[in-house]
Amino acid sequence: MENRKNFFHLHLISDSTGETLISAGRAAAVQFPHSNPIEHVYPLVRNRRQADAVLQSIDKEPGIVLYTIVDPELADFIDRRCIEIGVPSVNVLEPVIGTFQAYLGPLARRRVGAQHVMNADYFARIEALNYTMDHDDGQMAEDYDQADVVLVGISRTSKTPTSIYLANRGIKTANIPIVPDSPLPESLFAAKGPLIVGLIATSDRISQVRGHRELGTVSGFDPSDYTDRASIAEELKYARSLCARHNWPVIDVTRRSIEETAAAIIALRAKPR
């Protein structure tokens, strides 16, 4: 019998920072130890245009959708689109709000992110989230010097969820894919401010996770090589060599949770450079 864990996509859509939703999703996922969620976190989704872009991404990598959206019309839009796509969805807050209303009476009004105190720390986190979402997967490469952290790594080394976790702690984080024969942007090497960290994992782990990604969405790869362990080993060799050449620290995420990877990065930031 094969012992390999099954992977599934877990899409988390929030109109705020997403912390509440991440906790709920992980609390549920941990009850299924033989299934491993591939988290996709979409914070600050507050209008139909943003929601539609998210749902297009979900359509390419179907899975379970959890969302905390206070606006009833936007929540209804997400629910209907999930039905059209054919994926299960749960509005995590709605049953709780319904119970509160039944006991306390109708809401005066619904407030996005009302659980967060509007202080300097909160606004720093929102600024970090905005920066991180704008600089996901190599986007907006011209201003990496404004980042606190830049994560580099081959496809499926948890760069995006780690970036969002760090952003939720007020750390502006960009991430860039390492693709052999595709040079990294010169702006990265010119940046003096950020800590640059390489993320790696074992070939087996990456192959398993990549096997659950729709190959048509992957650029820069021959589909036959994308999940091939020998090809992945070559990608990892290139990534390690690149990080060693530039003296960038490397973290192996194979057996680390997102929280553990983020904690290791935060510890690296605390060290003199």
Swiss-Prot record:
Q: Name the residues that bind ADP.
A: G153, I154, S155, R156, T157, S158, K159, T160
Entry's Gene Ontology molecular function annotations:
ADP binding; ATP binding; phosphotransferase activity, phosphate group as acceptor; protein serine/threonine kinase activity
The keyword Nucleotide-binding is annotated on this UniProt entry: yes
InterPro entries (UniProt xref)? Kinase-pyrophosphorylase, PPDK_reg
**Keyword Lyase tagged:** no
Tree of life domain:
Bacteria
Q: Which reaction does it catalyse?
A: N(tele)-phospho-L-histidyl/L-threonyl-[pyruvate, phosphate dikinase] + ADP = N(tele)-phospho-L-histidyl/O-phospho-L-threonyl-[pyruvate, phosphate dikinase] + AMP + H(+); N(tele)-phospho-L-histidyl/O-phospho-L-threonyl-[pyruvate, phosphate dikinase] + phosphate + H(+) = N(tele)-phospho-L-histidyl/L-threonyl-[pyruvate, phosphate dikinase] + diphosphate
Q: What class of enzyme is it?
A: transferase
EC number of the protein: 2.7.11.32, 2.7.4.27
Which keywords does UniProt give here? Kinase, Nucleotide-binding, Serine/threonine-protein kinase, Transferase
Q: Which family does it belong to?
A: Belongs to the pyruvate, phosphate/water dikinase regulatory protein family. PDRP subfamily.
Q: What does this protein do?
A: Bifunctional serine/threonine kinase and phosphorylase involved in the regulation of the pyruvate, phosphate dikinase (PPDK) by catalyzing its phosphorylation/dephosphorylation.
Q: State the name under which the record lists this protein.
A: Putative pyruvate, phosphate dikinase regulatory protein
- Species source reads Allorhizobium ampelinum (strain ATCC BAA-846 / DSM 112012 / S4)
